[in-house]
């Protein structure tokens, strides 16, 4: 019988199928070897062999506690509890601190209902490892499940005598609550709060008394807690927040019992005991808001805050945040003291340093608030001007630094009061004493609003003298003249900034400014001037491929001189119609000239990568604007990629080189001029 050969399709197995099969095989659990034991002799032989294996392994690695547990479990399965106990005991001699070993040993005794053995074992466990909570809980659960209440209570008492963590105490409390032994719970809490005197412990006791006790018990617990906190405050066990939490809880509980006088007295005593605790004061205010008179509450709050702020400021006169809050309070609650407070603020908080820092800035903001208050609330212009003069002449050290905001505020104040000449003098003085860019900009903005453009030009000239390296100044000056329609001034500004001999602007800044210049000439329809600027743009960009491409695209999108004349003629003939510029073959030709010029430039520089970039751009250009013949012509000019090897520092390395078809054509010998003339004469004779 002929056998069929499997086809390639039949034998093909994908990697995915292989992985799936392996995964499925891995998922299948390997079954343990089944041993059939037929008689007692075979059982003895099996037990002997397994014991030999366990003993041999434990001789090699006696610290493997898991193996000890498995060995003991094997003996338990063989119903040989005597051997199992022996193994557990041997394991405990190796490592008595291994908790799972104790648990398995105890569970083994419990499973065979050897309660006394288990109890003795648990006694040993908690004696050997008294700080392991798990062993205590195991013992307690067993005894409580057997309903041995007294044993459980004695165990808890013994455990808590070691001052364990809060979980042990909480468990003891929960146990006594389950037994409804309320006095026992109180006795536990009396020891609990000594071992763990945290505020949370006291509050737990209070919650217990609220639920299971009476008013007197609850009040006594609160009182005991307050006394304890007061007597042990030097130990710094409790934070201000915890103290306030306890007092607030006590006071609100008294209020719930309608003992409002007790609550108020409690707050007063607590504040006297902890005068720096702001949370207590806040709690008192909250209490008064609920149970006090409105007017008394507001006055109490205001005076209390005033005293607090004055205390803070007497300790640190440079706390400007507190000065602001203090001024807010005085203006709202004590308006008659506001002027005196302002004077005190600007005198006491004046910085001593002669360097501009955050402290000086915040101090000046106090002055600004004072000045704004005088103008808006008092409407006293004379006093306001005096404050400005005082601030400028006596406060700010202009030889070291100044604040432009103050000069500009003063100038705007004078303009609002129709004193423009003095405002100009003030800003001129600011520029003369300590010139700053912000002062110049503010001065320019004011003069622009006043439409004094000649003055604006003079300020810009001073500004440029002060900071000639700031590109933004040149740009804004040019935009100003452009908006005013003075084209010659715009060109003059750009020309001075872009002068080849000037070094105050970086090359990057000049490139940005030159782009603005090109945009300006383009919008002015001075396309030839823009093209000349593009030549400078190429130079500043070090004739990068991108700059050549931008130049070529500019040639496409802008009309030539002849096209401008034609457009003007058409516009004159069709006055009512808008004539739009359309890209013609002439524009495409100018763009191709730029591309070709770039190719020649990179060819002469032997920059093959740059040359390739230009060809790729030309290819994209022809796909948009060219014919199929143009596109094929460009594709034929693309280089052939060749991998070469060169020796670099004694090591051969592979690099990519480009062979351009144009270079190959240039290397071919050109036909003789005489032969070309002869061929041409022969063609003419044939005609």
Swiss-Prot record:
SUPFAM superfamilies cross-referenced by the UniProt entry: TPR-like
Q: Which Pfam families match?
A: HAT_Syf1_CNRKL1_C (PF23231), HAT_Syf1_CNRKL1_N (PF23233)
Whether DNA repair counts among this entry's keywords is no
Where mainly found?
A: nucleus
Give GO BP annotations, semicolon-separated: cis assembly of pre-catalytic spliceosome; DNA replication initiation; mRNA splicing, via spliceosome; spliceosomal complex assembly
Which InterPro entries does its entry note?
HAT (IPR003107), HAT_Syf1-like_N (IPR055433), HAT_Syf1_CNRKL1_C (IPR055430), Syf1-like (IPR045075), TPR-like_helical_dom_sf (IPR011990)
Q: What are the ranges of the HAT repeats?
A: 45-77, 79-111, 113-145, 147-178, 180-211, 213-247, 251-283, 300-332, 337-369, 383-416, 451-483, 525-557, 629-661
Record-level Gene Ontology MF annotations = chromatin binding; DNA replication origin binding
List the subcellular locations.
Nucleus
Alphabetic keyword roster: mRNA processing, mRNA splicing, Nucleus, Repeat, Spliceosome
Listed SMART domains? HAT
What GO terms fall under cellular component here?
chromatin; post-mRNA release spliceosomal complex; Prp19 complex; U2-type catalytic step 1 spliceosome; U2-type catalytic step 2 spliceosome; U2-type post-mRNA release spliceosomal complex; U2-type prespliceosome
Q: Which residues form a coiled coil?
A: none
Keyword Nucleus listed? The answer is yes
Q: What else is known?
A: Present with 2140 molecules/cell in log phase SD medium.
Q: What does this protein do?
A: Involved in pre-mRNA splicing and cell cycle progression. Required for the spliceosome assembly by promoting the functional integration of the U4/U6.U5 tri-snRNP particle into the U1-, U2-dependent pre-spliceosome. Also recruits PRP19 to the spliceosome, as a component of the NTC complex (or PRP19-associated complex). The association of the NTC complex to the spliceosome mediates conformational rearrangement or stabilizes the structure of the spliceosome after U4 snRNA dissociation, which leads to spliceosome maturation.
The family classification in the record reads: Belongs to the crooked-neck family.
User: Which PANTHER family does the UniProt record give?
Assistant: CROOKED NECK-LIKE PROTEIN 1, PRE-MRNA SPLICING FACTOR
Quaternary assembly: Belongs to the NTC complex (or PRP19-associated complex), composed of at least CEF1, CLF1, ISY1, NTC20, SNT309, SYF1, SYF2, and PRP19.
This protein is called what?
Answer: Pre-mRNA-splicing factor CLF1
Tell me what organism the protein belongs to.
Answer: Saccharomyces cerevisiae (strain ATCC 204508 / S288c) (Baker's yeast)
UniProt lists the gene as: CLF1
């Amino acid at each position: 019988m002929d056998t069929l050969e499997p086809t390639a399709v039949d034998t093909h197995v994908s990697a995915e199928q292989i992985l799936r099969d392996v995964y499925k095989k891995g998922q299948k659990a390997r079954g343990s070897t089944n041993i059939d034991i037929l008689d007692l002799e075979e059982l003895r032989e099996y037990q002997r062999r397994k014991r030999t294996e366990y003993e041999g392994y434990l001789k090699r690695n006696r610290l493997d506690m898991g193996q000890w547990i498995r060995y003991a479990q094997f003996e338990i399965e063989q119903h040989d509890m005597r051997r199992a106990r022996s193994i557990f005991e041997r394991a405990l001699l190796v490592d008595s601190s291994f908790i799972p070993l104790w648990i398995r040993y105890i569970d083994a005794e419990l499973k065979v209902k050897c309660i006394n053995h288990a109890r003795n074992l648990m006694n040993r466990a908690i004696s050997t490892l008294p700080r392991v909570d798990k062993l205590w809980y195991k013992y307690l659960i067993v005894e409580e499940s057997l309903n041995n209440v007294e044993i459980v209570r004695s165990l808890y008492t013994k455990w808590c005598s070691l001052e364990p963590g809060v979980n042990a105490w909480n468990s003891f409390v929960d146990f006594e609550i389950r037994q409804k032994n309320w006095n026992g719970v109180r006795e536990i809490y009396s020891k609990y709060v000594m071992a763990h005197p945290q505020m949370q412990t006291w509050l737990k006791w209070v919650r217990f008394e609220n639920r299971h006790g009476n008013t007197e018990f609850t009040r006594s617990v609160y009182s005991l807690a307050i006394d304890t906190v007061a007597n042990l405050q030097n130990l710094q066990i409790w934070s201000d927040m915890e103290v306030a939490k306890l007092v607030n809880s006590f006071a609100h509980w008294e209020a719930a019992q309608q003992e409002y006088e007790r609550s108020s007295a409690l707050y007063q005593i607590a504040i006297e005991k902890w005068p720096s605790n702001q949370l207590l004061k806040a709690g008192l205010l909250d209490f008064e808001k609920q149970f006090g008179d409105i007017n008394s509450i507001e006055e109490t709050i205001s005076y209390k805050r005033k005293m607090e702020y004055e205390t803070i400021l007497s300790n640190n006169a440079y706390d400007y945040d507190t000065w602001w809050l203090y001024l807010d309070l005085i203006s709202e609650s004590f308006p008659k003291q506001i002027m005196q407070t302002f004077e005190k603020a600007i005198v006491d908080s004046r910085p001593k340093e002669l360097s501009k820092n955050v402290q000086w800035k915040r101090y000046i903001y106090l002055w600004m608030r004072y000045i704004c208050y005088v103008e808006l609330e008092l409407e006293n212009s004379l006093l306001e001007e005096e404050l400005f003069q005082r601030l400028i002449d006596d406060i700010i050290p202009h030889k070291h630094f100044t604040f432009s905001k103050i000069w500009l505020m003063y100038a705007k104040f004078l303009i609002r009061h129709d004193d423009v000449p003095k405002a100009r003098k003030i800003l001129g003085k600011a520029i003369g004493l300590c010139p700053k860019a912000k002062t110049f900009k503010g001065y320019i903005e004011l003069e622009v609003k006043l439409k004094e453009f000649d003055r604006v030009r003079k300020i810009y000239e001073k500004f440029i003298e002060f900071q000639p390296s700031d590109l933004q100044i040149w740009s804004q000056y040019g935009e100003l003249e452009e908006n005013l329609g003075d084209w010659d001034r715009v060109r003059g500004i750009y020309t001075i900034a872009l002068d080849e001999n000037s070094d105050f602007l970086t090359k990057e800044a000049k490139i940005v400014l030159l782009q603005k210049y090109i945009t300006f000439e383009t919008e002015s329809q001075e396309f030839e001037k823009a093209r000349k600027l593009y030549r400078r743009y190429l130079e500043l960009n070090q004739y990068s491929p991108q700059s050549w491409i931008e130049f070529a695209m500019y040639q496409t999108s802008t009309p030539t001189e002849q096209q401008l004349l034609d457009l003007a003629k058409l516009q004159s003939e069709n006055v009512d119609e808008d004539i739009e510029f359309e890209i013609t073959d002439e524009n495409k030709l100018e763009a191709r000239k730029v591309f070709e010029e770039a190719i020649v430039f990179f060819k002469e520089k032997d920059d093959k990568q740059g040359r390739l970039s230009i060809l790729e751009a030309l290819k994209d250009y022809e796909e948009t604007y060219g014919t199929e013949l143009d596109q094929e012509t460009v594709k034929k000019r693309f280089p052939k990629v060749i991998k070469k090897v060169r020796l670099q520092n004694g090591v051969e390395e592979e690099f990519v080189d480009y062979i351009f078809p144009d270079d190959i054509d240039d290397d071919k010998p050109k036909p003789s001029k005489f032969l070309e003339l002869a061929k041409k004469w022969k063609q003419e004779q044939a005609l």
